[in-house]
Amino acid sequence: AAFCRDLLRRLEGEKGMPQRAFLVEYRLARHGDYEHGSYPAALLDAFVAYLYLIRTCGFRPENIILSGDSSGGNLALALCRYLRDEGVENVPGSLLLLSPWCDVSRSHSGPLPAPNPFSTTVLNNQSDVITASLLYRNSAVCPLLGRLPASETYKNPYISPVSLQLDAQSGVYPPHWGFCGFPRHVFINTGRAELNSEQHVTLAHRMAEGTVSGVPQYSGDCDYSEDRAHNMSWRDQFPRTKGWVSRHD
């Protein structure tokens, strides 16, 4: 919400730029209330909101920039996947992701007893505002999963779209684990001090590799900010973000 408000404030009055935002108050996952906000509650809420924009308000999908930060970035990716797989409506024209949480399984960091020492989850554990501790991770993952088994974080692309245990190219046509059929214009903002920085690189690579008969389908853009922690880099890189928005609005 803060990003959208700041973006609109800075773009106010500029010709050809977005002048309004639609913020979705979706159900949040909460400890001890697995019937209320656990997966797929937020995805269903986002889907209904998207249908409202298109079918009630009359917006065209190609004119929509779908944005999300952190877990909201995870939700934005899940919504694009659902729209692609179900074919109810076209995916939005553009996708803007700020420090998206895209590997809930933590497959990049390796098993807890013997983590990968070169993973940003290990290297950036002291530099990020979030922590790699098991307690912190479970405080977010358990409410999200609800009554689903932990294995869902590894094998469900709606939950962990860049899990290293998923085959990124298993099939050309949906449904599959890859990113064919996603928005053609994608911007990913990340910081080199983030725990999840390597996830964002994997996401950018997998999106760029989305192919049909070997032809690249995406013009992805992954934007790094030096020494910035989780969800803190977009203000530094606002001019570049603004430039991307102006090209794809």
Q: Positions of the model-derived regions?
A:
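Alpha/beta hydrolase fold serine-hydrolase catalytic domain that processes acyl esters and thioesters
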Residues: 55-63, 78-249
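Conserved catalytic-core motifs of eukaryotic protein kinase domains, centered on the activation segment
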Residues: 32-35, 108
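Alpha/beta-hydrolase active-site loop
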Residues: 36-57
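Short amphipathic alpha-helix adjacent to the substrate-entry channel of hydrolases
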Residues: 2-22
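Gly/Ala-rich beta-loop-alpha elbow adjacent to hydrolase catalytic centers
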Residues: 68, 72, 76
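Charged catalytic carboxylate motif
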Residues: 45, 74-75, 199
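Short beta-to-alpha linker loops that shape the active-site pocket of alpha/beta-hydrolase fold enzymes
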Residues: 24-29
